[in-house]
Amino acid sequence: MPKMKTKSSVKKRFKITATGKVMCGPGNKRHGLINRPQKMKRTNRGPQTMTDMDAKTIKQWAPYGLS
């Protein structure tokens, strides 16, 4: 049986921690920031943890994990 391939978009956008959580960068940071509240801009700075259902899908698309 051939090897399964990891989706290229998943490699670029997500990281899997040692405990198995999936981390992603938040959206809504490209333009229109002058209209957004300061709290939203502040919380969008760092990486965020994905929900369990979304993380399950991402892990299926990355069968060998992400380094």
Curated annotation (Swiss-Prot):
Keyword tags: Ribonucleoprotein, Ribosomal protein
Q: Where is this region: Disordered?
A: 21-50
Query: What GO CC annotations are associated with the protein?
Result: ribonucleoprotein complex; ribosome
User: Which Pfam families does this entry report, sorted A to Z?
Assistant: Ribosomal_L35p (PF01632)
Question: Per the record, where are the segments of Basic residues compositional bias?
Answer: 28-44
Family per record: Belongs to the bacterial ribosomal protein bL35 family.
HAMAP family the UniProt entry points to: Ribosomal_bL35
The entry's protein name is: Large ribosomal subunit protein bL35
The species this protein was found in: Gluconobacter oxydans (strain 621H) (Gluconobacter suboxydans)
Q: What is the lineage of its organism?
A: Bacteria, Pseudomonadati, Pseudomonadota, Alphaproteobacteria, Acetobacterales
- Name the gene that codes for it: rpmI
